[in-house]
Amino acid sequence: MKLLAATVLLLTICSLEGALVRRQAEEPSVESLVSQYFQTVTDYGKDLMEKVKSPELQAQAKAYFEKSKEQLTPLVKKAGTDLVNFLSYFVELRTQPATQ
């Protein structure tokens, strides 16, 4: 029993000392964190610009946009037609009671 109590006491003291050491440790300043963040964003932007310059990626993007345009054009035309029909239905409803 004494061994168990001593073990628990030792673990408690060690965890408290660890917490104390963590509190006393120097925290990184906000300026260094912001500087590191901007450096990372800048590096990422440079890498992205290098990747965008490749002709293969440009060809893939162009093919994607052309395919999207081919697929969306009929949908947009149908949506426009449906909208005109929908609005004309309400215009006809409004003019109908006036003629009766």
Curated annotation (Swiss-Prot):
<comment type="similarity">
    <text>Belongs to the apolipoprotein A2 family.</text>
</comment>
<dbReference type="GO" id="GO:0018206">
    <property type="term" value="P:peptidyl-methionine modification"/>
</dbReference>
<keyword id="KW-0732">Signal</keyword>
<dbReference type="GO" id="GO:0030301">
    <property type="term" value="P:cholesterol transport"/>
</dbReference>
<dbReference type="GO" id="GO:0042632">
    <property type="term" value="P:cholesterol homeostasis"/>
</dbReference>
<comment type="subunit">
    <text>Monomer. Interacts with NAXE and NDRG1.</text>
</comment>
<dbReference type="InterPro" id="IPR036172">
    <property type="entry name" value="ApoA-II_sf"/>
</dbReference>
<keyword id="KW-0964">Secreted</keyword>
<comment type="function">
    <text>May stabilize HDL (high density lipoprotein) structure by its association with lipids, and affect the HDL metabolism.</text>
</comment>
<dbReference type="GO" id="GO:0050766">
    <property type="term" value="P:positive regulation of phagocytosis"/>
</dbReference>
<dbReference type="GO" id="GO:0120020">
    <property type="term" value="F:cholesterol transfer activity"/>
</dbReference>
<dbReference type="GO" id="GO:0032757">
    <property type="term" value="P:positive regulation of interleukin-8 production"/>
</dbReference>
<dbReference type="GO" id="GO:0050821">
    <property type="term" value="P:protein stabilization"/>
</dbReference>
<dbReference type="GO" id="GO:0008289">
    <property type="term" value="F:lipid binding"/>
</dbReference>
<dbReference type="InterPro" id="IPR006801">
    <property type="entry name" value="ApoA-II"/>
</dbReference>
<dbReference type="GO" id="GO:0018158">
    <property type="term" value="P:protein oxidation"/>
</dbReference>
<dbReference type="GO" id="GO:0008035">
    <property type="term" value="F:high-density lipoprotein particle binding"/>
</dbReference>
<feature type="modified residue" description="Phosphoserine">
    <location>
        <position position="54"/>
    </location>
</feature>
<feature type="modified residue" description="Pyrrolidone carboxylic acid">
    <location>
        <position position="24"/>
    </location>
</feature>
<feature type="signal peptide">
    <location>
        <begin position="1"/>
        <end position="18"/>
    </location>
</feature>
<keyword id="KW-0445">Lipid transport</keyword>
<keyword id="KW-0345">HDL</keyword>
<feature type="modified residue" description="Methionine sulfoxide">
    <location>
        <position position="49"/>
    </location>
</feature>
<keyword id="KW-0873">Pyrrolidone carboxylic acid</keyword>
<dbReference type="GO" id="GO:0046982">
    <property type="term" value="F:protein heterodimerization activity"/>
</dbReference>
<dbReference type="Pfam" id="PF04711">
    <property type="entry name" value="ApoA-II"/>
</dbReference>
<keyword id="KW-0597">Phosphoprotein</keyword>
<dbReference type="GO" id="GO:0034366">
    <property type="term" value="C:spherical high-density lipoprotein particle"/>
</dbReference>
<keyword id="KW-0558">Oxidation</keyword>
<protein>
    <recommendedName>
        <fullName>Apolipoprotein A-II</fullName>
    </recommendedName>
</protein>
<keyword id="KW-0165">Cleavage on pair of basic residues</keyword>
<dbReference type="GO" id="GO:0042157">
    <property type="term" value="P:lipoprotein metabolic process"/>
</dbReference>
<keyword id="KW-0813">Transport</keyword>
<feature type="modified residue" description="Phosphoserine">
    <location>
        <position position="68"/>
    </location>
</feature>
